[in-house]
UniProtKB/Swiss-Prot annotation:
The chain crosses the membrane at residues 20-40, 64-84, 95-115, 235-255. Residues 41-63, 116-234 are extracellular. Residues 1-19, 85-94, 256-270 are cytoplasmic. This is Tetraspanin-17.
Length: 270
């Protein structure tokens, strides 16, 4: 009988997974670099880059931080995944996997803690919003963010309009010389659909009136309660987005680990 010869195929790196991971990460790299550039440009316009102490001078949140942090994380992840896949560099691929895995577990832990400690989270959110209410006039980006939130969720302050008493320009003390005394920002006002020109003085002296008289002119519900209501009303959409992000992260992890295994198998045959 003729001898049977068995042929073994040498292991090779899968091109599909390699270039899919490369393409997947180059998008994140570019987007991250764009966010980071926008953040640094915004800081440059505000003079923060020439005066780093300005970062700590602001009592509230500087929204530019979101662009810088998100852009920085996306840039680092995108670079490691992109170059690691293209150059078949196991160190960069492992770094990508560990970094992405750490972010995933931090997100998972944050979600669990937010569910378990709902009351504590609510109190912290109240405190966070009120700290930003105090700093409303200190930073234009923060001011625009608060105005957007109050208009979008039809709310005013953390718990209600009286939270604006925390701001030096809007408080009702006799020593306050501001024209905005006992008022609220225009973003708290109930807009008239027929009004073409925005009335930025609509909130002046409004808190001198009784609460029932305020209801037709300004939003009387707090932003924390309105945000919770929005989450409940859009729970399916929010959950879908979060699950989608988690699946993308798991998919990226699997691709990176599979590529590392292929590279190790090829190197083992050298």
């Amino acid at each position: 009988m003729p001898g049977k010869h068995q042929q073994f195929q040498d292991p090779e790196v899968g091109c599909c997974g390699k270039y899919f991971l490369f393409g997947f990460n180059i998008v994140f790299w570019v987007l991250g670099a764009l966010f980071l550039a926008i953040g640094l440009w915004a800081w440059g316009e505000k003079g923060v880059l020439s005066n780093i102490s300005a970062l700590t001078d602001l009592g509230g949140l500087d929204p530019v931080w979101l662009f810088v942090v998100v852009g920085g994380v996306m840039s680092v992840l995108g670079f490691a995944g992109c170059i690691g896949a293209l150059r078949e560099n196991t160190f960069l691929l492992k770094f990508f996997s560990v970094f992405l895995g750490l972010i995933f577990f931090l997100e998972l832990a944050a979600g669990i803690l937010a569910f378990v400690f709902k009351d504590w989270i609510r109190d912290q959110l109240n405190l966070f919003i009120n700290n930003n209410v105090k700093a409303y006039r200190d930073d234009l980006d923060l001011q625009n963010l608060i105005d957007f939130a109050q208009e979008y969720w039809s709310c005013c302050g953390a718990r209600g309009p009286n939270d604006w008493n925390l701001n030096i320009y809007f408080n009702c003390t006799d020593l306050n010389p501001s024209r905005e005394r006992c008022g609220v920002p225009f973003s708290c006002c109930v807009r008239d659909p027929a009004e073409d020109v925005l009335n930025t003085q609509c909130g002046y002296d409004i808190r001198l009136k009784l609460e029932l008289e305020q209801e037709g002119s300004i939003y009387t519900k707090g932003c924390v309660g309105q945000f919770e209501k929005w989450l409940q009303d859009n729970l399916i959409v929010v959950a879908g987005v979060l699950v989608g992000i988690a699946l993308l992260q798991i998919f990226g992890l699997c691709l990176a680990q599979n590529l590392v295994s292929d590279i190790k198998a090829v190197k083992a045959n050298w």
